[in-house]
Amino acid sequence: MKHVTTDLCDANEPRLADGTLRVMAPVFRAFGKQQAFAGPAATLKIFEDNSLVREALESPGQGRVLVVDGGGSLRCALVGGNLGLLAEKNGWVGIIVNGCVRDTGELDVCDIGIRALAAHPQKSQKRGAGERDVAVQMPGAVVRPGNWIYVDADGVLVSEEKLGA
């Protein structure tokens, strides 16, 4: 069953008012075959180094969404075609990147949903720097591990708990 972000907002106005349901800023471009996806969040806080992205995506996704706070950097890509395929293979439903992706043609055939600020041809560094499973500041909303993420063509929602259809 698909969750529609507009319907979720309309049905949960008290949660929007008290901040237990948040809307990310409308700054993301869509990549990947899945235009709508939902699941609990796993989080990363990194900057121009995607080592932890690979490490996370090598683990079983179990229907989760990987939320990557890349600091909004537009100087390199944090996710590319190989990582998109890895995410699909390991059961992740989506990736949201506060940063860039590359290999967009490859990403667009991956059977997951991806949101990112832009595309950039340069790869990131590989130093192993960053934090995993921490609260991250995404554009317009804080995301904590285990928050529920709902994504479709109208936007990205962050909920403190799983919402009904």
Swiss-Prot record:
Coiled coil: none annotated. InterPro entries: RraA (IPR010203), RraA/RraA-like (IPR005493), RraA/RraA-like_sf (IPR036704). It is an enzyme of class 4 (lyase). It catalyses: 4-hydroxy-4-methyl-2-oxoglutarate = 2 pyruvate; oxaloacetate + H(+) = pyruvate + CO2. Divalent metal cation. Pfam families: RraA-like. Its cofactor is a divalent metal cation. It comes from the Bacteria. GO terms for biological process: regulation of RNA metabolic process. GO terms for molecular function: 4-hydroxy-4-methyl-2-oxoglutarate aldolase activity; metal ion binding; oxaloacetate decarboxylase activity; ribonuclease inhibitor activity. Keywords: Lyase, Metal-binding. SUPFAM superfamilies: RraA-like. A divalent metal cation binds at residue 103. The keyword Nuclease does not apply. Its EC number is 4.1.3.17, 4.1.1.112. Substrate binds at residues 80-83, 102. Homotrimer. Belongs to the class II aldolase/RraA-like family. Catalyzes the aldol cleavage of 4-hydroxy-4-methyl-2-oxoglutarate (HMG) into 2 molecules of pyruvate. Also contains a secondary oxaloacetate (OAA) decarboxylase activity due to the common pyruvate enolate transition state formed following C-C bond cleavage in the retro-aldol and decarboxylation reactions. This is Putative 4-hydroxy-4-methyl-2-oxoglutarate aldolase.
